[in-house]
From Swiss-Prot:
Homodimer. Pfam families: Gly_radical, PFL-like. This is Formate acetyltransferase. It comes from Lactococcus lactis subsp. lactis (strain IL1403). One of its GO terms (biological process) is glucose metabolic process. It catalyses: formate + acetyl-CoA = pyruvate + CoA.
Amino acid sequence: MKTEVTENIFEQAWDGFKGTNWRDKASVTRFVQENYKPYDGDESFLAGPTERTLKVKKIIEDTKNHYEEVGFPFDTDRVTSIDKIPAGYIDANDKELELIYGMQNSELFRLNFMPRGGLRVAEKILTEHGLSVDPGLHDVLSQTMTSVNDGIFRAYTSAIRKARHAHTVTGLPDAYSRGRIIGVYARLALYGADYLMKEKAKEWDAITEINEENIRLKEEINMQYQALQEVVNFGALYGLDVSRPAMNVKEAIQWVNIAYMAVCRVINGAATSLGRVPIVLDIFAERDLARGTFTEQEIQEFVDDFVLKLRTMKFARAAAYDELYSGDPTFITTSMAGMGNDGRHRVTKMDYRFLNTLDTIGNAPEPNLTVLWDSKLPYSFKRYSMSMSHKHSSIQYEGVETMAKDGYGEMSCISCCVSPLDPENEEGRHNLQYFGARVNVLKAMLTGLNGGYDDVHKDYKVFDIEPVRDEILDYDTVMENFDKSLDWLTDTYVDAMNIIHYMTDKYNYEAVQMAFLPTKVRANMGFGICGFANTVDSLSAIKYAKVKTLRDENGYIYDYEVEGDFPRYGEDDDRADDIAKLVMKMYHEKLASHKLYKNAEATVSLLTITSNVAYSKQTGNSPVHKGVFLNEDGTVNKSKLEFFSPGANPSNKAKGGWLQNLRSLAKLEFKDANDGISLTTQVSPRALGKTRDEQVDNLVQILDGYFTPGALINGTEFAGQHVNLNVMDLKDVYDKIMRGEDVIVRISGYCVNTKYLTPEQKQELTERVFHEVLSNDDEEVMHTSNI
């Protein structure tokens, strides 16, 4: 039932909350600062699952398993909508079974039809699953709707098209929604939609100067206002009145779920992250515990129900998309812990409750649990986090001090994988990101050496550049050529990104996400790198060893021979690590020299997801690895292929132990890659100590060292930014992975159940370094080739 939103409603909802500076203008940030309670205790207060929770879990798992066998249901006769699709339930015959309502579609795991990103793509997804869109709907959409994909390809330059065809610039969000935007969904819980709509209306009225920028902003605010009304309508489908603020922690969780699921009904971005939700919910929970409104068991049950809902989220994806983002990730990144500007840590009981879901409802890839790590966090929480990583290998860690030095504040959160955002920041830091996937820097370098001819398809000219004709490669000559190749690559990449984000705002503006953000926002534009380690190692080989080019009769380089030893990135050798820093600096400075859409700031990520496998299959030989080559019939031969390492990881051929890897990564300048420097590591429990307690304590010390400036490398300010932590022995999981059993691991930037990986991706995963010692100063590191 709709409630009249009066001052009395706010007095009732906010009773017991401190402070006034968050009441007159929406600011979850200020609300949290005034009201959160740091928790210094341990996990002993946590409750286990209820029978009801386990019943809901079983229904979800059984339904998903069934559809994985027979095929998932798809909408084929209706376009997705926030409020026009009926309410959905876990069990339509027992609606009271649920505690937290709101689902992505009207039926569990029914996949929404989302054509606004690209009608052809949406229809191709159906075709790949043996289905087709309703002919009448196709006719209406094809005649009346311009999709983002349509707009992008109307504007793409010939240089972009060549780069896409060569797979040097590929995988961009030009055929799928961009993602990486995080609404402050707790705003709905704290204020209700009516308050937020009135605030948007005031901001619309305040814009009086009519120019191109303000015309667009007024239209966007209007769309946000309409989206908030649709969120109210969505809540009403379940009998919920989200126009008013939440009265207790159950409603706060419920309101957040309605806001988030409204987003997931209409936006299928490559990452749909949740943001900094636990700390806000904890404030409601602490008030309810003090009042005796709910027990700890009840609050954990609400959290479990919410997380189970998040795990039902699924988008219809094309096969080409799955090659880049395998395992069907949704990147429901949930950020917790961290430090406040006043020196207080931000660990709360709710952080424990979210991590506890790995035990109560079982290990799973989603939500993407992310701990913002600082050495000053309570030891009990750090130890609990490490204990859960030791048990589950499904938590990622981000270094607070590294990100804070670059201006990311106390309510920053992680988007997608490793990318910091500060959604409510009023001091000019990034509120959102214009996502740009990544490009193949190694391929661009190899193509440049061949005079702009593709490194696999030698007859295909990608860009104009003088080739390097030396038989023995000279470092300075190669760097001059590489510098010009990077000019072409970054120019082309920026042009593509500006077009993509202009067209996305024009044809598929994410109004419902933007409605939960400040009206005036500042964006970064995320540019990524793939093939980083092999690029660095190739340049190191050219500089410190002897690299001979192998050419065909036309002078085309098809392979390389290396004589002598050379340092590799990841071995804690400044000779290689300085090259890594130089490559990042060159790349970032070239990007930053461009004018970007809506005056965004260029940021760089060393992150690949599973695209390192896809890019490997599109790249020829380099001085340090075997790539693909063409058979006589023109098909690609992958028989000798060595996969790229993921993200910022060193090559599998690097001789460093885990500590050497950490030191090399800590040297990288975050200012040159402040979209994230992703390290995915696998370490054997045996490398950490003899007993489980010793292993957990050592993990705490290692992460403290990696994330604390100067702690890992004395006399420096170097510190790391991100770690995907897997604590496991390869021999314990190898057979399970290859047989397609459930094995949850962290890969580059997210968590995946390995049964959903392709055979090639499983192969690449099991070929990664699994550290059996912490440092190669003691013993050799075990590679999987030794198994």
